Design a protein with these regions (language model features):
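N-terminal auxiliary "cap/dimerization" subdomain that precedes the catalytic jelly-roll/cupin core
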Residues: 2, 6-87, 91, 335-390
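Active-site region of the double-stranded beta-helix
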Residues: 16-33, 46-203, 211, 216-253, ...
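Proline-centered helix-kink/hinge sites
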Residues: 39, 208-209
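Residue-level signal for secondary-structure boundary elements
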Residues: 39, 43, 66-70, 128-132, ...
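Helix-loop elements that line ligand-binding/catalytic pockets
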Residues: 232, 238-318
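Acidic, low-complexity/disordered tracts enriched in E/D and polar residues
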Residues: 279-357, 378, 388-392
Length: 392
C-alpha cells in the first residue's frame, strides 16, 4: 500500500517536470543536443532532493540475497571488491566508523524503494525498454570506484553530501580506454582528467556512453545512478538463436555411414564442415520472429528478481486502480504485448487498455474490466506483477 501511495503520481510523463530536470531543455532538445553526444550538468535539477534512502536501509538491502550489491574498498593504490549479500552487522559497524575510502553500491534499488522508483520514472521521456535501474552508492570520505567508463548512458544525481567527478572524453572505437590488467574493477589505465565538477545535493550530471569518469566523495555522500540498457549485438544474436531453438530450430544429427579410417586423426574432415555450414544455412526467421524475441528478451526480469504474489480474493476490479509492480517490465509491439518475458496476443478491442497500462504503468480497473481483461489482470495480481489499490 505504501509503495502505491508514494509512486502513483510520477508514473505519468510530465514535460514540465522533465524540462526542470534537464535544466530548462525540453526532452526533444536534450535528446537532439546531448544524448550520446556530450555531457550535461544541471545545477539544482532536483531542488531540495535529500535522497531516496537512508544509510541504514541501504545496508539492509545489501545484506539481502535477492539484491545485487558490492563493497569497494581502496587502500593506498590497491582495490578490494566484496560482492553481496554482505553481512549487515559488519556494514553497520563500517558505516559508523571513521574509515575512509570505501563505497557501498546497490543495484536495482528502485525495485525495493519507492522514492528510487519515482526517480527512475522522472526519465520517462526515454523508452521503457531502454531504462534499466537506479544504482545507489554510499561513499565515505575519499570513497569511489576508480576511473572507469560505461557502455551505456547514465544520469548521476547527487543526494546528500558532495562528490567530485573527474571527466575525460570518450575514445572512439576501436581504441577505447585501456584497462588496468588483473584489477578487481574495470579501471582505466593512466586516466587523465580533462575536466572536473563537484556535484552538490540535487545536482545532475548526464554522461554519454564511453566517457571516462572518476567520482571521489569529498564527504560522506549518496549518489544515484540512473542507468540505461544497451544490448550488445553478440548478446542479442546468441539469445535469438536460443529463442529459435526453443521454437523448433532444425536439429539434424550428423551421420557418416561411409566413414573410413582416419589417416590424420586430428584433422576436421570436410564432410563435418559441410554439415555445419548446411545447418546454419537452413536457419530462417521472419520480422515477426524478431519482434516476438525482442519483446520477450527486453521484458524478461533479471535473474535475482523475485515477485511477491497476492492471495487476496473477491477483488472487484472495477473499483480498483491497477499499478504495475516496480520490478515488472511490460512492453508491446504491434498486436503483441509482453509481460515479464511472456507474450500475449490480445483481441483488438483489448489493446488500447493494455497499451495504457504499459505506457502509464497504471490504468483504471473500470477500463480494464470493460475490455474483458478482468481474469488476466487478477492473474497478474496473484503473480505479483501488479498491485490493485482502491480507485479514486
Amino acid at each position: 500500500m505504501l509503495y502505491a501511495t508514494l509512486s502513483l503520481a510520477r508514473h505519468i510523463y510530465n514535460q514540465l517536470m522533465e524540462e526542470a530536470l534537464l535544466g530548462g531543455l525540453s526532452p526533444q532538445a536534450f535528446l537532439r543536443r546531448h544524448w550520446q553526444k556530450r555531457p550535461l550538468l544541471v545545477r539544482g535539477a532536483l531542488p531540495g532532493f535529500g535522497g531516496a534512502i537512508t544509510k541504514s536501509a541501504l545496508c539492509a538491502l545489501a545484506a539481502r540475497g535477492d539484491v545485487e550489491s558490492r563493497l569497494v574498498e581502496r587502500r593506498n593504490s590497491r582495490w578490494r571488491v566484496t560482492h553481496g549479500p554482505l553481512e549487515r552487522a559488519g556494514l553497520t559497524r563500517l558505516a559508523r566508523s571513521n574509515a575512509r575510502n570505501w563505497t557501498l553500491l546497490v543495484n536495482g534499488a528502485n525495485h525495493h524503494n519507492a522514492q528510487a522508483e519515482d526517480l527512475l520514472r522522472r526519465f520517462a521521456f526515454a523508452p521503457q525498454a531502454r531504462l534499466d535501474d537506479v544504482m545507489v552508492s554510499y561513499a565515505a570520505r575519499g570513497g569511489g570506484v576508480g576511473p572507469h567508463f560505461d557502455s551505456y548512458d547514465v544520469f548521476l544525481v547527487q543526494g546528500k553530501g558532495r562528490r567530485r567527478w573527474r571527466l575525460a572524453k570518450a575514445r572512439p572505437e576501436p581504441r577505447p580506454f585501456s584497462l588496468i590488467p588483473d584489477a578487481p574493477l574495470k579501471l582505466i589505465a593512466g586516466f587523465r582528467a580533462e575536466a572536473e565538477v563537484v556535484l552538490e545535493p540535487g545536482d545532475l550530471l548526464y554522461l554519454p556512453p564511453g566517457w571516462g569518469h572518476d567520482g571521489i566523495a569529498l564527504e560522506p555522500c549518496f549518489t544515484y545512478s540512473v542507468g540505461f540498457r544497451a544490448p550488445r549485438g553478440a548478446e542479442l544474436a546468441a539469445a535469438f538463436l536460443d529463442h529459435l531453438h526453443e521454437r523448433g530450430l532444425p536439429d539434424a544429427v550428423y551421420r557418416d555411414p561411409g566413414l573410413r579410417p582416419a589417416a590424420r586423426p586430428a584433422l576436421i574432415g570436410p564432410e563435418l564442415t559441410a554439415f555445419a555450414e548446411a545447418q546454419l544455412a537452413r536457419i530462417r526467421w521472419t520480422r515477426g520472429d524478431v519482434e516476438e524475441f525482442l519483446g520477450r528478451y527486453l521484458s524478461t526480469p533479471k535473474p535475482n528478481v523475485v515477485f511477491t504474489g497476492s492471495s487476496r480474493r473477491g477483488i472487484a476490479l472495477s473499483r480498483c486502480e491497477a499499478i504495475l509492480d516496480s520490478k515488472t517490465q511490460m512492453l508491446y509491439r504491434g498486436a503483441r504485448f509482453f509481460m515479464n518475458g511472456e507474450v500475449l496476443r490480445p483481441r483488438p478491442a483489448q489493446r488500447a487498455a493494455l497499451a495504457r497500462l504499459a505506457d502509464d504503468r497504471r490504468a483504471p480497473g473500470r477500463m480494464l474490466a470493460r475490455a474483458g481483461l478482468e481474469r488476466l489482470i487478477l492473474e497478474w495480481h496473484r503473480a505479483g506483477f501488479l498491485l490493485l489499490e482502491a480507485g479514486p
